[in-house]
Amino acid sequence: MIYKTFLLFLFPIIIFSQNKSYKVIGVKDGDTVEILMDGKPQVVRLSHIDCPEKKQPFGNNAKQFASDLCFGKKVKLSTGWKKDRNKRLLAEIILSNGKNLNKELVKNGFAWHFKKYSKDNSYDDLEQQARKLKLGLWNDKSPTAPWEWRKSRKKSSQQSFSSTSKIK
């Protein structure tokens, strides 16, 4: 009974929170923005997607695309209020025109559907369409997924560390 009462109390808060607007005060990269939430900055990691890193081809294009659509504007969040290991809030960003920023990035070829963390097939459909039309990064001959790029960078930095840290 107490649990049901708690849920009845919590449900309107969750619904209200998702209808609240937040100002985007920063765009860190294609899939990470900063919003003003209750007067404090909150970093938001766009769920379902992974954009190229800034040092990758199309990384800065993804950041600019996201920035053009949302920087300095009011947005809504569609979120389960979960955070990733870096304490970033995971969410879909809903723009003032009703479009979903996360989906717009995939649709225009600036992000991959991050299947490891998402089972939403609508993102996969958008990615396949962008690939077919050779939009954005799909115009590149051999685009490297960001998770593969990060993995290769991690391996090369570990190899260079181990070769420079031999005991004499």
What are these regions (language model features)?
Residues I2-F6, I13-K168:
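Small beta-barrel nucleic-acid-binding modules, primarily SNase/OB-fold domains
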